[in-house]
């Protein structure tokens, strides 16, 4: 089957560590005997998934499917959780660890959203000499990321490099930053997270006229110190799935 769809040789072959012998050894023997070529260049054998420090199995009644998990969490959170440990190490699934993964992913997404917001409202277009010097410092994060991925697909350390970039971006940008500088930081963050399949560059949802009107009305209410009305509008928007965040640079919003 693999020969039919992938050819006589495979770049990467993955599977559970319990399949090394005899399953994968038999695949190698059959394929290389038939084709006279190396079957797979790289083998990636993952360790097992445990549930609350116990082996996941139907007999123990702790078996969880991806579909069941998706009812509680966005599957991007599950991806982040699985990438947070080296694939050759056992991974423990628990509600606490999933919440930690959710918070970690939100931290990255929020950084990306903030860079987009600042860029959209930036008064200056071109990078300053100081910003250029700052951006050069991000080369270290890229080097750390690439070093981790080249070290047997060490996604845990790669994510650590992404968090270093997030911390840098949060600490070295503000409303005075140029659009070019903010754009470069955003593009770099997207470039690294794309490698991991993490989608931080979410397309902005277009607000319909009613919601736009409510946001404008809330701003007017705040200006008039009618905070009760402003809070009521915020609650109304939340019911529509719109979360508002008041910042010094203006109002930011995102889908709940």
Residue ranges, per PLM feature:
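Catalytic cores of enzymes that engage adenine nucleotides and/or redox cofactors via long glycine-rich
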Residues: 1-72, 78
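Structural preference for alpha-helix termini/caps and helix-kink/transition segments
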Residues: 55-56, 62-256
